[in-house]
Amino acid sequence: MASVNQTVQLDLANQSVREVNQFLHQDFDDGNAHYIEILHPDGNHSIGVGLDADADIDIRGHAGYYVAGMNRQARVTIHGNVGWSVAENIMSGSVRVKGNASQCAAASGHGGLVVIEGDASSRCGISMKGVDIVVGGSVGHLSGFMAQAGRMVICGDADAGLGDSIYEAVIYVAGKIHGLGADARKEPMSAEDVAAVTELLEQAQLQHDPQKFKRIASARTLYHWNADVEQEY
Amino acid sequence: MCGIVGLLLKTEPLRERLGELMVPMFTCMAARGSDSGGCAFFGESGDSPWRRFNLYVSDRQYPWQTLLDDFKTEFDGKNGSDVRFQTLENHAVLTAANDPVVVREWFEQRDPKVHLMSVGRNMDVYKDVGDPVEICKRFRFAEATGSHCVGHTRMATESAVTPVHSHPYTAGEDFCLVHNGSLSNPYMLRRRLEREGIRFETDNDTEAACRFIEWRLREGDNLQAALTTAFTQLDGFYTLLMATSNRICLVRDAFACKPAVVAETDEYVAISSEFRSLAHLPGVAQAEIFEPKPEEIYSWRV
């Protein structure tokens, strides 16, 4: 049973990212609830990469590239904007960005939940493999490129090339779609889809009407090579 | 990697603080490129009769006075020119009304070690190899005033690390360009431009992009037309940030793999490779923040 809160403050003004990450890599599996606050991230790269801990982590400020990459279990909140590849290859747990995210948010994520409260840039959810992503704002071009599994909810608009070469992941978009990628198509929303969007918006704590979302999924025409199609190179 | 920064100030009071505001942007991006650093500053626009010639030598104890005395003897009084100059270690700004072609030739003959980095009525260019933070201190970027600037921190991935290979690149007058990325057809562009009689100073890919775009502008294209042509002719990865005496302009290639983020308020437009270098700017929390789209032209007037 979880006992007393173990609150720890780490300050990147006095410690290196490597020192902070080494602290975060210790064995937290002691039955206690852990709360860790990281101060002065100042856009440093690779903060909190490789976490595998039942812990709540608040990063107070802007983070750089790869923050919370490969996350397991931990619930990480970044109180600012993040650079490229936040929560890249996330396995489980959750990562929440209070501001905007740059390119490749949650790239190749296997599980867990990634919430971007602001906008995400291009290639959001590229090659996602089971992670759930909720973006409060809009996403940039080529989001969901080769997305294999998992769900992505976009409350704003999506730029060109959405879901290009998508496999079995599903994308839900409330706003305008500025062009679908190859083999991505709009499909009717089923009751299960509305339930999925409702559940994900609840988890993300974002208020939107689930009925307004469109479903984008694979037309599966790229699954097999079609020699009859006219090829020009 | 490389770092690029740009800042355009929309209000007069802020223009007194151009250097002060850009220095943290620039030094932050030194982490993306530690080979070389440089910045082009644009002072108050307006039609000055004088051209500003920015000169560079690698020797920090260079006897500028002798050179400039000779220049005065040669040019003072000609074409109504009233030659003035200011020097700062291995950099000098010479103000004169003479023809840039004649001036360039004179310097080449007088001392080939002296490199004419830029010509323009509003633009000063400072660049060198070495730690960008040191370059920034040596050339007193913090004291700069003016309407806009573009800077670059370089981590070379193709041509040599020398002062002339560092950014910003300039071509023509009052035009400069910084680049993050790499072009795959710079020699094709270069051969094309050399047939037009355009001379190159380095074997660097960015110089090809810089001279190509300036050539299109000089041939009468507006910015839109010049850059639309550039999209079809430049092959490779690029985020390009350009400046003229009255605007800055930003474009990314079709894949937009090279980073750029823009923060715009009523008071300024700030551009950087990474958001963290904009985080100190006043009112940035309320700024409109976005990443530019591929092959879209973003241009801001002073």
Regions found by a protein language model. Give the residues of each.
Chain B
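Conserved short alpha-helical segments that host acidic/polar catalytic motifs at enzyme active sites
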Residues: 1-302
